[in-house]
Amino acid sequence: MNTDESARREAIATSRRWVVKIGSALATREGQGLNLEAIADWAAQIAEIRAGGREVLVVTSGAVAEGSARLGWRSRPASLNQLQAAAAIGQMGLVRGWELALRESGLLAAQILLTHEDIANRERYLNSRSTLLTLLQLGAVPVINENDTVATEEIKLGDNDTLAGMVSNLVDADLLIILTDQAGLMTADPRQDPDATLISCAPVDDAQLLAIAGGGGAWGRGGMRTKVTAARLAARSATSTIIASGRSPGVLRQIGAAQPVGTLLRAPATKLAARKQWLASTLHVRGSLRLDAGACTVLREQGKSLLAVGVTAVEGDFERGELVSCIGPDGQEVARGLANYSAAETLLVKGLPSSRFEERLGYLRDLELIHRDNLALV
């Protein structure tokens, strides 16, 4: 560990607010019921971290696996109804396991269940944030999971790595810890390449990280790729991420002692404004705008609003005020924001200067398709 990494880990170790994400492979016994001994150990470590003046939020998976075990199922169900039924049954055991473990360590647990709607709706987003911050002020440990019982494809977050990244944004966390069944992010899949080595530290926006990340296991929904994506999501609130093995004894204590465990993905020092964090965190867009190279440059380098003259194509069916994605000529997402005009209106004015809006539409509502205050780079 070099001097720069050592200094960064020491700063992170003493940071105030941590989000700890624990996946199904760790919270359960290979998908067959909860690993209560492991949960008790993490709870004891969290109590030590809390005693050092830090705040901790837990994002935990395992409800579907626990419910399946209680139902006698040997594999993850395929149908949505069965998944939701298993989640409903398993969530009872999951939250009780955490409640008892945290209580044994002298801590108060609080259950929070979220869906994408709670993030996408601005009012519910702010209310979720207020609730979480109030729980921290009261000294409780929020135990958070996706509400699989009611989530449909339209409102699913997708996996708890993504949820952990969003929670980090919600509460302006200093550190996101993603515990997994691997030592951290490797140079290659260690199950296929015996020469793979651990990446100790890297900037979260390193373009090579996603290229070397792999897939997930049978019970979890997220592989290493989703963990890197979650780290990038968390970085929007200047939250650094450590991906480490949850099976390493005392892993949270080691992180609290600035030990070189896992992979540290460094976030930039600057964070997005709160409103733009919310915009960037909303996963479900209603449509997309294809931009020319000039428009991409204006958005990325000058921080200006999106004008119709730089739009080459319109995709999807969206209304005024709905979220749209801005796609560059290379097919990569550049930004997302709230549309000032519907898809039908945008089709009529794409490629035109704002001075011709009234001619084509019969009215001029706004000069911009997306105002810079409602636009977030991704």
Predicted features along the sequence, with ranges:
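C-terminal catalytic "cap/lid" subdomain
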Residues: 2-76, 80-108, 112-378
